[in-house]
Amino acid sequence: QHYSFNRYADIDGITRVYISKTLLKAIIKSENPAMKISGNKVNLNNKELLSKMDGILVLTGTNTRIANMMHEDATKLSHTKEYEHILYRNEKELAIDVFTRESKGVILEIILIDKTDQNNRIIQLMGQFTPDDILSMIKI
């Protein structure tokens, strides 16, 4: 079971976008299946990668209080056994945390927390991934 961000479904000050597996299949069939999320920081730039996804959820906090609340909630993942904190980078041009949940050597969920600007974003990718998939998505 993936981490639920449902508490943010109806909160004022949060933009919530979900892309289903069905829509991802349509994107794969298009001539240019590239998707960029959170500016140019997360690139989902090939059919093979998109075909591994079961869904994408993007939450953007549109004010500082909400953005901080989202960030605090998401970083609680590092205190659980199910999630591993695999990447932390904090520079002016890129400030991200990446968490993964895996089972039997397969990464089932990737959660990226983008703190680069005042509008924190949480990007949740569900599917079946490899470590190389993560490296292809994120500019490190």
Q: What spans do the regions from the language model cover?
A:
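Surface-exposed amphipathic alpha-helical segments
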Residues: 129-140
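Terminal interaction module
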Residues: 67-69, 108, 139-140
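Localized chelating/binding microdomains
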Residues: 3, 37-38, 59, 107-108, ...
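Extracytoplasmic
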Residues: 11-14, 51-53, 91-93, 107, ...
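A short, solvent-exposed beta-edge/loop patch
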Residues: 99-131
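Short Gly/Thr-rich strand-loop-strand
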Residues: 71, 75-102
